[in-house]
Amino acid sequence: MGDAHRVGVVGLGVISRAYLDTLAGHPAVRVTAVADLDASRSASVAPGLPGVRALTVEELLSSPNVDTVLNLTTPGAHAEIALGAVGHGKNVYGEKPLAATLAEAHTVMAAAARAGVGVGCAPDTVLGTGVQTARAALAAGSIGRPLFASAVMVTPGHERWHPHPDFYYTEGGGPLLDMGPYYLTSLVHLLGPVRAVTGASSRLRAERVIGSGPRTGERIPVEVDSHVSGVLEHVAGTLTTITTSFDGVATTASPIEVHGEVGTLAVPDPNRFDGDVRLFGLGDTQWRTLPPSAGYV
């Protein structure tokens, strides 16, 4: 094996720990630097990571010891950091969404193409046993020709558990850009590309109340829609209805269901790598769980 691929991490919020722990055990990857707009975060994180330097964001983006920038900033900064990395000849992999707006996403992709560097974006959970087992079942004809599908993500809002949830309710946030990528990536993986979209959205509350951490009880403004419903028309002709909401308390709906001519497939939470894939065939009397047949755990 050659030299380890060198990664610099920008953004040291809640999600960064999962990435740092995973990369620490990967023999082909080495984290060489961390940075955050809040310098105290990088100064506190770096000492716990052997061989990792705490840098400013600009220092990390231009560092000769970084091959790929792992962009874990809040959504509103995704495009800015990605463009900075690309401008210094770095590959960039970021948390979802790729950018806060479609125009910014196009700008990032165009800049990367000109620079000859790679751009990647979460989610990678689509490679797990949940979605991959479902895809294998569809390919095997377990439900016949897919006719329509549904996707549902309902939560009262991340402010209940996240100590600094402001970004969920500003540009680049909201349920569709925050959680929707897991569902949309899986739907495209299972049913193919989408050629047309219809949607509607609403904003039911002007404020949210933080429910944990040092800011408990603080009210934050809601600047984006918190409920989004849509219909996706896949190229193959399948129709998918999708609901993503920060306004519902709970749901009994499967995260994703695909209905075919001879059966229905229930797909587990696409925000996870695993989970049971269940099949109800025409003439069956109950659901049955399919054994994992593909993907990574």
Give the residues covered by each predicted segment.
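Beta-strand-loop-alpha-helix segment that lines the small-molecule cofactor/substrate pocket
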Residues: D67-T68, T74-P75, A79-V126, G141
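Predominantly a Rossmann-like dinucleotide-binding segment in NAD(P)-dependent oxidoreductases
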Residues: T125-I220
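Hydrophobic residues in well-ordered beta-strands that form the structural core
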Residues: Y93-G94, V119-C121, S150, I242, ...
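Conserved SAM-binding strand-loop segment of SAM-dependent methyltransferases
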Residues: G51-E59
